[in-house]
Amino acid sequence: MEVWTLKSLRWKIAIIIVGFILVTGTVLGGVNYFSARSILEDEIYNRQTQVALLLVQGIEDKLTQYQRILATMAEVAEIEAMDWDTAAPYLEEKILALKDFEIFYLVFPDNEFIGTEGNSGNLGDRAYIQETWSRQKGIISEPIISKATNVPVVAITAPIRDAEGTMIGILGGTLTLDFLTEMALDIAEGQAGYPYIIDDSGLVIAHPDASIRFQANFLNTEADYVTPELAAMTQQMVAGEQGLATYSLEGEEYLCSFAPMPLTG
């Protein structure tokens, strides 16, 4: 079975995660901010750091697990045959068993693909497909919009090889980004406030409110929901800074601890 080394896996995850920031926010409500900050600052900062590290490790473990699964699947006879009628029953069984995956698909040498949702098309313009061919190794993509379902996903690939070891195709699978939010909420369960994740453009990737994910950008100062304080804090975040800040949103004041948490450490 062909798998990545930890170094190369972390490098790819860093591309996906680089600029993602875990934020833990605590509502101050009627508590006097200045006294609350002196009491809560260390507690919130330490809690945020712990939650962020747990989340990063959890994401790494999850993606490592799924990359290994895909690499193993790419070596079974049904996939190596590079025939959709042969592969389809096997992949349809796997999609039922592996609930986090949205679809599985085969990519042929001309970059045409067929997926378990009955979808097809050409993925030649996708950077992660090009990189899989050029490196002849599995890839984890940055967050993208799925051509098959039009929802935000992360794609995982594994090379398909013939008996001589020549790469003849690609096995791909897409994960919806819901697992990021679910993992963040599970790790933060029982704590005051909630975590969310943004990318290095300010776009919200994971958030308890599903309507915000991939819709809200906290650098978009023209949006009603982005206050000057929130935009300023987000600027610090995407610059890779770490610290504490306050902002008001919908009548509530939040004390936030934030830090960049790329998986490379």
Language-model regions, residue ranges each:
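N-terminal sensory and localization modules of signal-transduction and trafficking proteins
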Residues: M1-L6, I139, P143
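Extreme N-terminal signal-anchor transmembrane helix of membrane signaling/transducer proteins, especially
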Residues: V3-S38
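Extracytoplasmic/periplasmic sensory segments of membrane signal-transduction proteins
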Residues: N46-L53, I59-P143, T149, I187
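Sensory input modules used in signal transduction
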Residues: S141, T157, T174, F258-P260
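Helix-start (N-cap) segments at beta->loop->alpha junctions
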Residues: A148, G173-M183
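Intrinsic low-complexity, intrinsically disordered coil/linker regions enriched in small/polar
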Residues: D162-A163, F179-T264
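Sensory beta-strand/linker motifs that couple input domains to effectors
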Residues: T166, L171-G173
